[in-house]
Amino acid sequence: MEANGFGLQNFPELKNDTFLRAAWGEETDYTPVWCMRQAGRYLPEFRETRAAQDFFSTCRSPEACCELTLQPLRRFPLDAAIIFSDILVVPQALGMEVTMVPGKGPSFPEPLREERDLERLRDPAAAASELGYVFQAITLTRQRLAGRVPLIGFAGAPWTLMTYMVEGGSSSTMAQAKRWLYQRPQASHKLLGILTDVLVPYLIGQVAAGAQALQLFESHAGHLGTELFSKFALPYIRDVAKRVKAGLQKAGLAPVPMIIFAKDGHFALEELAQAGYEVVGLDWTVAPKKARERVGKAVTLQGNLDPCALYASEEEIGRLVQQMLDDFGPQRYIANLGHGLYPDMDPERVGAFVDAVHKHSRLLRQN
């Protein structure tokens, strides 16, 4: 029995806890695997389901989110599901308009330009209560998973969310967001604090609704050097973990493993390993053996095959997976890609990746 905002939930018993055991640092019989963006446009059934409505309407439909989350599990023997949603539901909940422009990505018609624009943002407590549709999607999906594998909830980290809110969309340089850090450090901290104040109840709410693990995406870590990262990203990454854990305990909810994925944040690996997360996700630019040396045995590592490796032949994918697993070692490890799946990828190659992880990790343990 688990509590959530809708009363006590009776969820089906979990049959495959390999992913959770690896996340907690316990021994596993094989290496668990899932893929970032496993519910994505590379699947024809995903494109068919999504064609019916615009992107954020889909995000607000618990039924559609549940269906999209389950689709990859019908095809592949994945060891975890991740709820279909988007990190930008948080700026929306704060009252900002966000649209998804086909072929271009997210767009904010009125980005934050001045410090006074922060006054437009909704109160963080009110913003968190706007996200009930995500909680409903999680509860529905957890029921329909029928205990097959654990369900991961997620959110974007404060700095990454700030970049979209200030830039007004994607950017190759993040120059406007970084200008804020240099010219308006206090306003930047204020905004990052507001985002943290929304993320904490949002992530706790996801667990209350049925999420069994949480991943925080710091997708734009690589745009910050060591100094800016330690000033404007890391303190909030730490704060989210600390406050979510305390909040779960206060609400009488069981702890869940938390994953931090800071893309291109290899310069802060040691700090991330000590930021209060059980798992550190790696992108493909990090050598597994070196990462293991740098973080020690205190955390589980997740990653980190180059997604583009899935354009290779199945034989080559098998070889690359074998190398990756040999380098990471059998325990305290969750296999994944170093970034999300791309829309033009062949589902059969994704299947080959998943199968190769299971096959080789079992052989690795026998030897």
From Swiss-Prot:
Top-rank taxon, per record: Eukaryota
Metabolic or biological pathway: Porphyrin-containing compound metabolism; protoporphyrin-IX biosynthesis; coproporphyrinogen-III from 5-aminolevulinate: step 4/4
InterPro entries attached to this UniProt entry: UROD/MetE-like_sf, Uroporphyrinogen_deCO2ase_HemE, Uroporphyrinogen_deCOase
GO biological process: cell population proliferation; heme A biosynthetic process; heme B biosynthetic process; heme biosynthetic process; heme metabolic process; heme O biosynthetic process; porphyrin-containing compound catabolic process; protoporphyrinogen IX biosynthetic process
Residues with N-acetylmethionine modification: 1
Binding annotation for coproporphyrinogen I: 37, 39, 41, 50, 86, 164, 219, 339
SUPFAM superfamilies hit by this protein: UROD/MetE-like
Cellular component, GO annotation: cytosol; nucleoplasm
UniProt site (Transition state stabilizer): 86
EC annotation from Swiss-Prot or TrEMBL: 4.1.1.37
UniProt entry keywords in alphabetical sequence: Acetylation, Cytoplasm, Decarboxylase, Heme biosynthesis, Lyase, Porphyrin biosynthesis
Secretion signal span: none
Subcellular location: Cytoplasm, Cytosol
EC top class, as a word: lyase
Single GO molecular function: uroporphyrinogen decarboxylase activity
Catalysed reactions listed for this entry: uroporphyrinogen III + 4 H(+) = coproporphyrinogen III + 4 CO2; uroporphyrinogen I + 4 H(+) = coproporphyrinogen I + 4 CO2
PROSITE patterns: UROD_1, UROD_2
UniProt-annotated binding residues for coproporphyrinogen III: 37, 39, 41, 86, 164, 219, 339
Family recorded in the similarity comment: Belongs to the uroporphyrinogen decarboxylase family.
Assembly and interaction partners: Homodimer.
Function: Catalyzes the sequential decarboxylation of the four acetate side chains of uroporphyrinogen to form coproporphyrinogen and participates in the fifth step in the heme biosynthetic pathway. Isomer I or isomer III of uroporphyrinogen may serve as substrate, but only coproporphyrinogen III can ultimately be converted to heme. In vitro also decarboxylates pentacarboxylate porphyrinogen I.
Protein name: Uroporphyrinogen decarboxylase
Taxonomic lineage from the root: Eukaryota, Metazoa, Chordata, Craniata, Vertebrata
Gene label: Urod
